[in-house]
């Protein structure tokens, strides 16, 4: 097996793909996604994809490319806001349950119940007792979803501190990304180490090294297509790069593959 390491970077790295190569590759993979949707509609499958990661790790852009040419009737994106007062007094998982996929549906969660393990814990929006109460049953909750027939895929998009800083600064000056600017953006960098400490117990995930957002998008789609069965699959197109999409290994916390 090839050794996987993280290259130290300061700012944006040189692109691995030309703009045209990226567009061509994305188009071919989106054709495969349409095939996948046709198949899971015919077979009454239920698919749930969760994307987690630090602020500005590329979740929005990845989801946009996945759903771009899919039927909106059978595709839903879930990005829940601040919990209501009622949510705050309910069983923690309760607010997510209504959004789970039914037969013939693909649902993508842009962040998920893992908010409790990440941003809520770091920012003090939950108590340590509430965090521990979440971490205990979360695996059982997900096993229950899988036993009910939901095909569950979980991706954690991992970026370097330098890349996050550049992307957050870019949001502030881009008039088309003002909706992404948040009052807690500055806290993402200030609390970098606390987010790392909160991230680690959430494993295992499929890890995506996402400093290059184009490569991350393509390889996430490839991994989704590899993991799910559908008719007419073009196997030549869907092999993801093992340097970008990784099955979680605890050693990655020590050898620098995951951003420290």
Which residues are covered by each model-predicted region?
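Charged, amphipathic alpha-helical linker segments immediately N-terminal to NTP-binding catalytic cores
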Residues: 1-28
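Conserved nucleotide-sensing/catalytic segment adjacent to the nucleotide-binding pocket
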Residues: 18, 25, 73-135
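Pre-Walker A adenine-sensing motif
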Residues: 31-41
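Phosphate-binding beta-loop-alpha motif at adenosine-nucleotide cofactor sites
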Residues: 48-52, 150-160, 182-187, 201-216
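Glycine-rich phosphate-binding P-loop
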Residues: 49-67
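Conserved nucleotide-binding/hydrolysis micro-motifs of P-loop NTPases
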Residues: 56, 83-86, 112-115, 158-165, ...
């Amino acid at each position: 097996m090839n050794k996987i390491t993280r290259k130290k970077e300061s700012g944006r790295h040189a692109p691995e793909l030309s703009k045209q190569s990226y567009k061509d590759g994305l188009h071919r993979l989106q054709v495969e996604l349409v095939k996948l949707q046709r198949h899971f509609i015919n077979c009454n499958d239920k698919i749930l994809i969760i994307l987690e990661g630090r602020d500005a790790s590329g979740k929005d852009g990845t989801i946009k490319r996945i759903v771009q040419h899919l039927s909106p009737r059978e595709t839903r994106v879930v990005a829940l806001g601040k919990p209501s007062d009622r949510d705050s007094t309910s069983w923690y998982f309760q607010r997510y349950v209504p959004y789970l996929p039914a037969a013939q549906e693909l649902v993508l969660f842009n962040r998920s119940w893992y908010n409790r393990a990440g941003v809520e814990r770091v920012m003090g929006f939950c108590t340590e007792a509430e965090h521990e109460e979440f971490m205990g049953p979360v695996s059982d909750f997900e096993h229950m979803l899988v036993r009910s027939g939901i095909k569950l895929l979980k991706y954690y998009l991992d970026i370097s501190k330098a890349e996050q800083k550049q992307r957050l600064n870019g949001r502030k000056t881009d008039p088309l990304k003002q909706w992404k600017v948040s009052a807690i953006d500055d806290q993402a960098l200030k609390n970098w180490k606390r987010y790392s400490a909160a991230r680690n117990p959430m494993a295992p995930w499929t890890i995506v090294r996402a400093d290059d957002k184009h490569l991350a998008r393509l390889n996430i789609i490839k991994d989704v297509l590899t993991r799910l069965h559908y008719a007419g699959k073009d196997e030549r197109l869907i092999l993801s790069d093992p340097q970008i999409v990784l099955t979680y290994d605890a050693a990655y916390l020590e050898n620098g593959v995951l951003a420290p």
